[in-house]
Design a protein with these regions (language model features):
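Active-site and adjacent loop segments of nucleotide-processing enzymes
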Residues: 235-265
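Non-catalytic, polymerase-adjacent accessory regions of viral genome-replication enzymes
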Residues: 1-38
Length: 265
C-alpha cells in the first residue's frame, strides 16, 4: 500500500509541548475538561424534514479547537479522494469525479460522528502523527462530548478523515486497479467505473468498505446502499451526474427553502 497522507509537523512527545502549542496550561485544560458540557451548545437543524442535533463550541474551548485545527490538522496533507472538510473542495468536486460513468456504487455511514469514539481517536493521533499516548488522549478528550464526536464542531470532520486514512488507502488502491474512482464526502462514499465491473469485484469492494466501517465502530446504512448501472438515474449528493452536472428538482427545492428561511431571519 502506498502511503498517501503526511503530517509535516514534529510529533508532540509530551504534554508540555501540547500546552505550548495551545497557548494554555494544565490548570486551564483541567478546568475546561471538568466543565466541558458548558462549552458545547446544541444547534437544532432540520434536514430532509427530520430534526437533527448539531453542536457549536463556544468560549475558551472554541479557541482551543481553533488552535488544534490551525496547528495540527492544517499540517496534514490528505489524498484527493477525501473531499469533505478540505479547504476549497466541495460536494460538487466530489460529483465531478463520477460524471458520465457506467457504474456508480454508493454507501452511507449511519450516525456517523457519534459512532466515532474517544478511544479510537486517541489511537489515531498516536498511529498517524506519532503523538505520545498522553497527548493523544488529551486531544481526543478535548475534541469529544460524552466520549464521542459530535456533528458541527470545527474538528469533527478533520478527525473523522484521520480515522479512515489507512483503510481508505487500501480501498482506493483496489478500486484503482479495476479502473475506478473512489471518493468520500464526510459520511458518503461513492465509487464509479467507466466500464462494466463483475459482481465478484463489486462484492469485494463493498466488503472492504464494510470492514473499514466496522473497525471504526461505524455502521453502514443499508437503505442507502446502491449499485447504479447504465439506464438508471445516477444521482450523487442530490446532483445528476449523467453527461453534465445538474441539481435534481428536490435539491433545487431545498436550496430555495434555505434561501427563504435566511430571508425570514
Amino acid at each position: 500500500m502506498h502511503k498517501n497522507w503526511n503530517y509535516s509537523n514534529k510529533p508532540l512527545a509530551n504534554l508540555e509541548s501540547l500546552f505550548k502549542m495551545l497557548e494554555t496550561n494544565e490548570e486551564r485544560l483541567t478546568y475546561l475538561l471538568k466543565n466541558k458540557k458548558n462549552y458545547f451548545k446544541t444547534v437544532p437543524v432540520i434536514r430532509k424534514g427530520k430534526k437533527r442535533t448539531t453542536y457549536k463550541v463556544v468560549g475558551e474551548l472554541l479557541k482551543i479547537h481553533e488552535l488544534i485545527k490551525q496547528r495540527i490538522f492544517s499540517k496534514i496533507s490528505l489524498p484527493e479522494y477525501i473531499t469533505g472538510g478540505r479547504k476549497g473542495v466541495s460536494y460538487i468536486d466530489d460529483c465531478k469525479s463520477h460524471l458520465n460513468k457506467s457504474i456508480i456504487i454508493q454507501e452511507d455511514m449511519k450516525d456517523f460522528f457519534p459512532s466515532i469514539k474517544q478511544d479510537l481517536i486517541a489511537k489515531a493521533f498516536q498511529y498517524y502523527m506519532n503523538f505520545s499516548p498522553e497527548v493523544s488522549s488529551l486531544i481526543a478528550n478535548l475534541s469529544t462530548l460524552e466520549g464521542s464526536l459530535v456533528q458541527g464542531t470545527k474538528l469533527s470532520t478533520d478527525i473523522a478523515n484521520l480515522i479512515f486514512l489507512e483503510e481508505e488507502a487500501l480501498i482506493s488502491e483496489e478500486v484503482g486497479k479495476l479502473g475506478g474512482n473512489y471518493t468520500r464526502y464526510v459520511d458518503d462514499i461513492t465509487i464509479s467505473f467507466e466500464s462494466e465491473v463483475n459482481n465478484e469485484d463489486i462484492s469485494k469492494i463493498k466488503t472492504m468498505i464494510l470492514s473499514m466501517a466496522l473497525k471504526s465502530g461505524v455502521r453502514l446504512n443499508r437503505k442507502k446502499s446502491r449499485v447504479l448501472r447504465n439506464g438508471q438515474s445516477k444521482i450523487v449528493h442530490g446532483v445528476k451526474v449523467i453527461k453534465e452536472i445538474r441539481p435534481t428538482q428536490k435539491r433545487k427545492h431545498n436550496i430555495r427553502m434555505c434561501l427563504f428561511n435566511l430571508k425570514k431571519k
